[in-house]
Amino acid sequence: MGSRPASWYEELEPPPALAEFVDRLWAQGIGDADGEGEAIYDQPVLPDGALDVVAVDDHVILAGPATRTTTVELAPGALTVGVRFRPGAAPGLVGASAADLRDLDVPLADLWGPDGAVIAERTVEATGWQARLQALVRGLIDRLGDARAPDPVGVGIAPLLADQPGRPLTAIAEDVGLSERQLRRRVEDAVGLPPRTLARILRFQRFLRAARAAGPGRHLARLAADAGYADQAHLTRESRDLTGLPPAALLTWEDNRLQR
């Protein structure tokens, strides 16, 4: 196998037509397209507060917002592409409440009927990750005529919670002119998660971004404090709850297996 990576991963900016709804496009491959590489690649999928349209092999699904880490087994040569929605923006284009999609993987044909089946067919028939992404993007652009604008409260809550993770929800609700109950309902419909669950996930993702940037010599206690955790023990509890692993073990796994 030589120096062939176990996994490669690419991210791209969305086209301007989808920028109101989509955060990024992404692709991941396992080994080489000829099937060389590890027998099975166990890919953890961590909660990130987002919904994705994902195409892997001959399946195209909408992956709802996750509250827990799951593991996907990818075969040698597997090619996965996806479109990640901005937190809170998906319902306007998807046509369903994000709360109804929580922790679910829904085939596109089940979600959008014949239109979804056509998008899925064109995507899986495309050759190469760029062509697959283009087919998926074209399918989403074709749906823009029936889309509604994202709920500004739903879209605005993620950056607000990320910047002020400890702020009382009542204060945030007052800022946007809603009762706390109304805010919870709007956020769950748009994002698919209760506000405090979303805040926990965003804080953990903030820690992960900083830890990945720091590399193997990272100082976990300092990174935990910078991300808003009370101490390293607090970070460890949250990491175990969200991923099943302590942070050091999770990051060591990434250091050893992923090329970013």
How would you name each of these model-derived features?
Residues T243:
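Short glycine-biased active-site loop of nucleotidyltransferases that positions the nucleotide triphosphate
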Residues V187, A199, E238-S239, L251:
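DNA major-groove recognition helix of helix-turn-helix
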Residues M1-E180, A190-P195, R209-A230, P246-R260:
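Alpha-helical bundle regulatory/interaction domains
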